[in-house]
Regions:
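Beta-strand-rich interaction surfaces with strong enrichment in secreted/lumenal proteins
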Residues: 74-77, 132-138
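Collagenous Gly-X-Y triple-helix signature in extracellular proteins
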Residues: 183-417
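A surface/secretory-pathway sequence property marking extracellular, secreted
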Residues: 40-67, 105-133
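Surface-exposed or flexible loop/turn and strand-edge residues in extracellular/cell-surface modules
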Residues: 34, 71, 86, 117-119, ...
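Short, polar/proline-rich extracytoplasmic segments that appear immediately after membrane translocation
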Residues: 2-70, 77, 162-183
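C-terminal, structured domain-capping segment
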Residues: 29, 79-108, 138-183
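Short consensus segments that form the blades of beta-propeller domains
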Residues: 112-115, 160-164, 245-246, 402-404
Length: 417
């Protein structure tokens, strides 16, 4: 431990050069017109402008744009793991000719980057996290906001911390040329309903979700389970989500199924001992069910700290699990505070149900359908006073319960990011 503390004092000095190259040669060839005619003074003007440093960044040499407006220079020194520096800068096409990305280059100490040191975070992307790629269009009289992030990783072991001061030269270069038929618009977030899962996941990871609203829906093909609808059930992360032991099931970007996907038992054993953690349904959802999701979506699903209520058997305690897929509890649906569920104080109501006015006295909005017919559906908490039951939601939306070995509706949720 003593060695680790000493190593924390070593510096990372980052010197970064951000370059925008202009494809003049391509343009001069294309505009080499012989004979009579008129060219209405087309202009080619792509450059950097509008540097903005993110709040929370460490002190650094303020990024500056050179007089040609094609290079951004800055340097930063990190002394403690967890420090970072981030800024945005606009790539502006102020001309009358559409441009597109031709070449993207990222170098560390003069060598194209394939891997980074274990202690270093570094990425240049569009502001929403989408990678900058060849053929991306930059239309005339438009701009794209680039984001530069560099940091000293926080969650690293003492062996990953450099044993001496490090000076790292990072350079990013993008070359724009006149656009042609290969030009495509970058896949920025536009609509939860129509965006690809990769675009959605990337947007959530970069906290760029303003175009996605609670209640927005998107259809998903579940193979043999048919086509179903997902909705955004939550976007907020209030202070209570950071409380030790607080379930993360209603914190962050949560998606839930609008309808009931299938009818299944919770467990083939007539007991709720062990709670959610011991159920066959949990195992199924986090294996077979998970594998039915599209790969781009599956890869973006986060591990979720999940708290479930316990039953009346002696020695029972809260069920604590780490899940990809989970069931809700009734607090998350109707802000329930009753005695049937012992985990109420460890979670919160989802944004969707809160904004829809769903409560225990107004539960209709919690009802769900299975193949078009109203049906009750399972929740994850064991019934607090009946040792063979788990909680559920009645077809009317009110709280209910069922024997662990009887079939009920399954309408799970998960988080992405």
């Amino acid at each position: 431990m003593r060695n680790k503390k000493r190593q924390l004092n070593y510096l990372l000095v980052i010197i970064l050069l951000l370059v925008i190259s202009i494809g003049y040669a391509v343009l001069s060839t294309n505009l080499n017109i012989v004979g009579s005619g008129t060219i209405n003074n087309p202009t080619w003007n792509i450059h950097w402008e509008n540097v903005q440093v993110k709040t929370g960044s460490v002190s650094a040499t303020t990024p500056t744009i050179d007089t040609a407006k094609t290079t951004v220079n800055y340097s930063v020194t990190f002394t403690i793991p967890g420090e970072y520096f981030e800024f945005t800068v606009d790539a502006v096409n102020a001309g009358t000719i559409d441009g597109m990305v031709s070449v993207v280059s990222n170098k560390l100490n003069g060598t194209e980057i394939t891997t980074l040191p274990n202690y270093l975070e570094y990425k240049v992307s569009y502001e929403d996290g989408i990678d900058i790629a060849p053929n991306h269009l930059l239309a005339a009289n438009s701009s794209e906001k680039y984001k530069v992030h560099v940091g000293y990783k926080k969650d690293i072991s003492s062996t990953d911390i450099p044993s001496s001061p490090q000076t790292l030269n990072l350079s990013f270069s993008v070359t724009y040329v006149q656009s042609d038929s290969n030009a495509v618009k970058p896949s920025h977030p536009e609509s939860f309903e129509t965006d690809s899962w990769q675009t959605i996941v990337t947007a959530v990871q970069n906290n760029y979700t303003s175009v996605y609203n609670v209640g927005d829906t998107k259809t998903i093909d579940m193979g043999t389970l048919g086509t179903h609808t997902l909705r955004i059930a939550n976007k907020s992360t209030p202070a209570e989500c950071f409380t030790t032991g607080f379930s993360q099931t209603a914190c962050g970007f949560v998606l839930e199924f609008v309808d009931i996907i299938e009818s299944k038992i919770v467990s083939s054993v007539a007991t709720n001992i062990g709670g959610w953690s011991a159920t066959e349904l949990r195992t199924y959802l986090n294996s077979t069910f998970l594998d039915r999701l599209p790969l781009e979506l599956k890869n973006g699903i986060k591990d979720t700290y999940t708290v479930g209520g316990y039953g009346p058997a002696e020695g029972e305690t809260l069920s604590i699990t780490i899940d990809k897929i989970y069931l809700l509890n009734y607090k998350e649906v109707a802000n329930y505070t009753g005695s049937i569920d012992t985990s109420n104080s460890y979670t919160r109501q989802l944004d969707f149900y809160s904004s829809s006015g769903v409560t225990t006295s107004n539960p209709e909005g919690a009802g769900k359908k299975y193949n078009g017919t109203d049906m009750w559906w399972w929740l994850r908490s064991a019934h607090a006073t009946k040792n063979v039951m788990f909680t559920g939601v009645a077809s009317s939306g009110g709280i209910s319960s069922g024997y662990s070995y009887t079939a009920g509706g399954v309408s799970p949720a998960f988080r992405i990011g």
